[in-house]
Each structure stands twice: as C-alpha cells, then as structure tokens.
Curated annotation (Swiss-Prot):
Family: Belongs to the universal ribosomal protein uL13 family.
Organism in which the protein naturally occurs: Solidesulfovibrio magneticus (strain ATCC 700980 / DSM 13731 / RS-1)
Protein name (Swiss-Prot/TrEMBL): Large ribosomal subunit protein uL13
CDD domains, A to Z: Ribosomal_L13
GO terms assigned for molecular function: mRNA binding; structural constituent of ribosome
Record InterPro entries: Ribosomal_uL13, Ribosomal_uL13_bac-type, Ribosomal_uL13_CS, Ribosomal_uL13_sf
Pfam families attached to this UniProt entry: Ribosomal_L13
Gene responsible for this protein: rplM
Biological function: This protein is one of the early assembly proteins of the 50S ribosomal subunit, although it is not seen to bind rRNA by itself. It is important during the early stages of 50S assembly.
Protein keywords: Ribonucleoprotein, Ribosomal protein
Record note on quaternary structure: Part of the 50S ribosomal subunit.
GO terms of biological process kind: negative regulation of translation; translation
Cellular component terms (Gene Ontology): cytosolic large ribosomal subunit
Length: 142
C-alpha cells in the first residue's frame, strides 16, 4: 500500500463560523488553529495547506482566566532607539479585539510561508455581523 499524498485538487475547503463570546482565548485559538491547519482531516499533510476557512464573530466578548487582562502585555518595536511599546490585553480588547485572537492563533501556526497562507483564511469580526453569508458557513462549537 502506497502512502497517500494529497494533491491540490483533493483539498476541499469548508467555511465555519465560530462565536467567541464567553470563550477562553487560548482554548478558542487552539481549536481554530487546528482547523486552519487541517489537522482534523484525514488527508492532512504537513507540507500543504489543507485547512478550512474560519470566521470568528464577537471577538470583543472573548474571556481570559486569572489576571491576564492587566498582566498580559503585547510588545512592538518601532525600530528606533527606545522605541519599545507595550499594550495590555485590556487596552487591546478595547481598541482592536480582532488582533488579540489573530495574535493568539498566529502563535499556534507554523512560522513560515505556509503559516502566513493559513492565517489569511481566518476572518475575525468584533461584532455579530460578517460579510460571508454567500459562503454558507456552518456553525462550529468549540
């Protein structure tokens, strides 16, 4: 019996919508990363993008445990001397709740060209509405 290697024509992409309200951030990101990567499918191959497309709604209502709202920091650097900026999770959820989930999922995907392609299939919205009704997404309970 030969080892099965999927071809691009063998890959079927389904659309799923995930409601992030009252979900723990890390557990939600882990489930979304598995679906984006395609590890839940039989035809998974680590060198190919076999994953599904995921729509996350209500990103502003995501929860964390403990005191992470004040203790967790997001860092970025401008490239200039003394240009290190830090933002707390509470501020990020107030200003850009989509980026909180995107950064959490990004850390769970491969750090290469394939991981960047997988991240493009993730659509995140702070509210309930999303413009992807034409794709007829199925609801995914995580």
């Amino acid at each position: 019996m030969k080892t099965f290697s999927p071809k691009p024509t063998d890959i079927t992409r389904n659309w799923f919508v995930v409601d992030a309200s009252d979900k723990i951030l890390g557990r939600l990101a882990s489930a979304v990363a598995v679906r984006l990567r395609g590890k839940h499918k039989v035809e998974f191959a680590p060198h190919m993008d076999t994953g599904d497309c995921i729509i996350v709604v209500n990103a502003a209502k995501v929860l964390t445990t403990g005191r992470k709202l004040d203790q967790k920091k997001y860092y970025r650097h401008s490239g200039w001397i003394g240009g290190l900026k830090e933002t707390s999770l509470r501020d990020m959820l107030a200003k850009k709740p989509e980026d909180v989930i995107r950064k959490a999922v990004r850390g769970m995907l491969p750090k290469n060209r394939l991981g960047r392609a997988m991240l493009k299939k993730l659509k995140i919205y702070a509210g309930e509405a999303h413009p992807h009704e034409a794709q007829k997404p199925e609801t995914l309970d995580v």
